[in-house]
Design a protein with these regions (language model features):
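Sec/Tat signal peptide C-region and signal peptidase I cleavage site
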Residues: 24-30
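Sec-exported extracytoplasmic/periplasmic mature domains
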Residues: 50-57, 67-75, 167-171, 175, ...
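Conserved SGNH/GDSL esterase-like catalytic core that processes O-acyl groups on lipids
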Residues: 103-128, 143-244
Length: 387
């Protein structure tokens, strides 16, 4: 195959092969109908695809196996749904503007539910306890006057585009603590499903990124996680439960990889109504906020899978809070702050932020972390305990 054609072939197949992980419910269902000898090991297929991406030559048998996996994956998933026509607004109400009486597919309003945009008192008190433990740590994770408080991002391309600009603005802001090191660990193409396996490559890349920044995994105490999966389908209950499952795994992995992680701030996507593809259009971008809320509500209710307190059993997760809520209904101003997204805030695909959009989101993030009553305790200039 001509080199250019081969490259084009891989580029076209990248989204498909990126989904070839061990956890593949649709493919598992499809394989149940195949004879045992014809079942596909999608983990092996993914390894072969990554081998080819590195420029290594596949044997004839390996190449045939990879093509067979691609065909099986296509057959189990079917064609991706088309994106709706781009539009300036949808008529959907931002979750932070919804009241306790408003309903969307049975869900009421408020970031924390019941029309509330602040955490319940018990959860806020628990958050303050966790926040009181944030202090400068050395490379071994021990308190030290010369240590660092590390704040990372975990998610996909939109997140790294936004968080990298946030880092630029925050590092230049005189309000930011000198003890805080911000590291962008989010990675293009790596949505929640890609981070969900405990041994997934994004975790290795994240640790390499930390090393390049001169810090370690034991110094990470705060994370920002942006919720999204690629090509969601179906109703909120259908695609939302998959995103909930994947993000729960991501949160657990983060706590395991970063043992001193105290707080994880969750955010949903920006407006997706200008999308020209099915990567994450509306209403999926809007609906990801409900999944973030489900996770926090699960933790508030005592879900053992998201337990953060040693008093309640094995610790599985950091404490969860809302980070900045980034969605607004296109050109329809959000009540709380008049936030809008114009077509110019999005790149050509209508899904990723443009340079102006990156800056808009980054400013929202800086404003949130330095003014929120809970986050400003570690984000802004003030004496953090060294004990």
């Amino acid at each position: 195959m001509h080199r250019n054609l081969a490259v084009s072939y891989l580029i076209c197949l990248a989204p498909l092969l990126a989904s070839l992980t061990v956890v593949m419910p649709n493919s598992v269902v499809a394989q149940q109908e195949l004879p045992a000898a014809e079942k596909i090991d999608f983990n092996r297929a993914r390894e072969l695809f990554q081998k080819r991406q590195k420029g290594e030559k596949l044997t004839d048998d390996e190449d045939a196996y990879l093509r067979k996996a691609i065909a099986a994956r296509r057959g189990s998933d079917g064609p991706a749904p088309a994106a709706p026509a781009p539009r300036e607004k949808t008529g959907l109400i931002p979750l932070s503007d919804m009241t306790a009486d408003d309903r969307y597919q049975g869900e009421d309003g408020g970031l924390y539910g019941a029309g509330r945009n602040a955490p319940p008192a018990t959860h806020e008190n628990a958050a303050r306890v966790e926040l009181s433990q944030i202090r400068p740590l050395n490379a071994a994770g021990e308190p030290a006057e010369t240590g660092r408080v590390v704040f990372i991002s975990i998610s996909m391309s939109n997140a790294t585009q936004e968080f990298s600009r946030f880092k630029q603005l925050a590092d230049a802001d005189s309000a930011k603590s000198d003890l805080l090191t911000i590291v962008d660990c989010a990675q293009g193409g790596q949505a929640m499903a890609e981070w969900a396996p405990a041994d997934a490559r994004p975790w290795t890349v994240a640790e390499q990124t930390l090393a390049r920044a001169g810090v370690t995994s034991r110094q990470v105490q705060v994370a920002w996680i942006k919720l999204a999966n690629k090509g969601p389908r179906g109703t909120l209950k259908e695609h939302g439960r998959k995103l909930e499952q994947d993000t729960t795994a991501v949160i657990q992995n983060a706590k395991s990889r970063f043992p001193n992680l105290r707080i994880a701030y969750l955010s949903s996507r920006i407006y997706g109504g200008y999308a020209v593809n099915a990567l994450n259009p509306e209403p999926y971008a809007y609906e990801s906020a409900f999944v973030a809320r489900w996770l926090i509500q699960n933790q508030v209710k005592g879900d053992a899978a998201l337990n953060y307190s040693a008093e309640k059993g094995p610790i599985k997760a950091p404490l969860l809070l809302w980070g900045p809520y980034l969605w607004a209904d296109g050109t329809s101003p959000r009540k709380s702050d008049q936030l809008i997204y114009t077509r110019g805030d999005l790149a050509g695909d209508g899904t990723h932020p443009s340079d102006a959009g990156r800056t808009k989101v980054a400013r929202l993030m800086v404003d949130f972390f330095k003014t929120d009553p809970l986050s400003k305790t570690w984000f802004t200039r003030q004496a953090l305990p060294n004990r």
